[in-house]
């Protein structure tokens, strides 16, 4: 993923940003509300960063694999896990755009602000389907479609997603019971001033 270097640079101060903290807590609350989480579940967070979202959910889940392709983020994550003394959170260096799929299968896969960085989102959704056990749940929190101002000039990923287009992609990948909810309203300073960007939560199941 092209943003690896910038995420490595951001990793040491990521957890100090109150917006990152607030966003993770809001999405965790939305996931709890929409998915019947269980401490018997094995879960995968893809694009976990420093682990803010999974730390907010860790008491609701069993073993959690926290996967990311940024070495800097994973270094901070490992320190966070060690400091908290949590033995059911497991870091994993993984980039599904290039790496082989893990052998493990999961009851839940979730992402936060990851999908818009992945060039081939359709393929990633298909990978998520493969990685889920039958009856498993998927939760994707990401940007609603925007005008490109969120990242600014030079960004090569997706400028958010149209909900109905993503719904169709999820159905095409094999998912069922696809629903969308607004999970967070993010305020961000841009070249055009302070802007608001809604984040959706897409929830789906593998039949």
Predicted regions and their residues:
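Short amphipathic alpha-helix with an adjacent loop that forms part of the alpha/beta core around
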Residues: 98-104
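Conserved class I S-adenosyl-L-methionine
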Residues: 1-38, 76, 83
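C-terminal lobe and adjacent flexible extensions of AdoMet/dcAdoMet transferase-like proteins
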Residues: 202-207
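Class I SAM-dependent methyltransferase SAM/SAH-binding core
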Residues: 44-98
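A conserved beta-strand element that flanks and buttresses the S-adenosyl-L-methionine
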Residues: 110
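A short glycine-rich, Lys/Arg-flanked "PGG" loop and its adjoining helix->strand segment in the class I
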Residues: 122-137
């Amino acid at each position: 993923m092209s943003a690896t270097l910038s995420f490595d640079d951001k990793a040491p101060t990521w957890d100090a940003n109150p917006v990152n903290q607030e966003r993770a807590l809001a999405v965790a609350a939305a996931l709890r509300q929409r998915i019947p989480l269980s401490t018997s579940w094995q879960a995968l967070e893809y694009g976990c960063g420093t682990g803010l979202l999974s730390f907010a959910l860790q008491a609701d889940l069993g073993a959690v694999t926290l996967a990311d392709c940024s070495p800097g983020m994973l270094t901070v994550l490992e320190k966070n896990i060690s400091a908290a003394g949590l033995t059911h959170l497991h870091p994993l260096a993984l980039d599904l755009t290039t790496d082989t799929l893990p052998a493990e299968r999961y009851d839940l896969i979730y992402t936060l602000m990851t999908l818009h960085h992945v060039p081939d989102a359709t393929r990633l959704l298909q990978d998520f389907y493969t990685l889920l056990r039958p009856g498993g749940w998927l939760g994707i929190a990401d940007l609603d479609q925007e005008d490109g101002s969120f990242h600014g000039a030079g960004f090569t990923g997706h400028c958010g997603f149209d909900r109905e287009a993503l719904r169709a992609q999820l159905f095409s990948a094999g998912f069922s019971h696809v629903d969308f909810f607004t999970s967070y309203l993010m305020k961000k300073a841009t070249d055009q001033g302070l802007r608001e960007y809604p984040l959706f939560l897409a929830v789906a199941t593998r039949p």
